[in-house]
Amino acid sequence: MTNPKLDLLQPYPFEKLRAELAKTQYVGDLAPIALSIGEPKHPPPQFVIDALCDTDAMAQHLATYPATRGSDALRQAVADWLHKRFAVNASAEHNILPVNGTREALFAFAQAVLSGQPRSLVGMPNPFYQIYEGAALLAGATPYFLANTANTGYQADFEGVSERIWDATELLYICSPGNPTGHLVSDAQLQRLIELAHRHDFIIAADECYSEIYFSEERRPNSLLAASDAMGNKDFARCVVFHSLSKRSNLPGLRSGFVAGDAPIIEKFLHYR
């Protein structure tokens, strides 16, 4: 006996690609360039390796169960980084929750916040990170795909969504910078989405794992939390962001990240975990 909703899930694309690539034969001495999974190709920071090799510290931490909230020091470090990077004042105690990488967090978040009503919708960009779709389906909701095509400038046309659809929406996943388009959701668009979230009673889950990959200091990607703060929504109501060390710090194997935003929602997510 298994959950029948599992039959709704599509095969994980990266596992399928891995199997197909394993059959490929390469000609010549040049190593192939992998364009399948967004895996960093640079070494991890040395100070992280040094910390992991500190046997005394590791012996102390590995011998005890960690707190689900994470340590006070870790949450404060996240709060300090959010202030330095995005100029927002997030409470280490109430607005931040460390997670084991954002893949599982993005999935689990939907299970924690969706009502389970069969007609509820979860908005998401298309193309998209497959976790968004799976999270919606396993939570009993219906994915609503927002096409990112050449006709829309490779971005979601939020203004083209009807009031009826917004009314049925319980959760909206956005990804900025977007994968695979690289599109940035502007501050004006983020604030418009926050207005819609308040009007139609849904939550925005912003996947910001690519926020530190950019070419110019003048065009650094912004955060949903910063847009929220700038419009006076200083408690980040209905806004939650997901950050990971995988891409920005070349540490996908560490499975380390955090979720930050609306304090009551973070508390509910902590209760779920």
Task: Tell me what each language-model feature is.
Residues E208:
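Walker B catalytic acidic pair
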Residues K41-P45, P180-H183, H200, E212-I213, ...:
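Short catalytic/ligand-binding loop motif for oxyanion handling, primarily in non-cytosolic enzymes
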Residues T2-E104, A108:
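N-terminal small-domain helix-loop-helix segment of the aminotransferase-like
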Residues H61-E195, E212-I213, E217-N233, V240:
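Conserved core of the PLP fold type I
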Residues A226-R273:
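Conserved core segment of the aminotransferase class I/II
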Residues G28, A139, R199-H200:
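Helix C-cap/helix->beta junction micro-motif
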Residues I204-A205:
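Residue-level marker for buried hydrophobic side chains located in beta-strands
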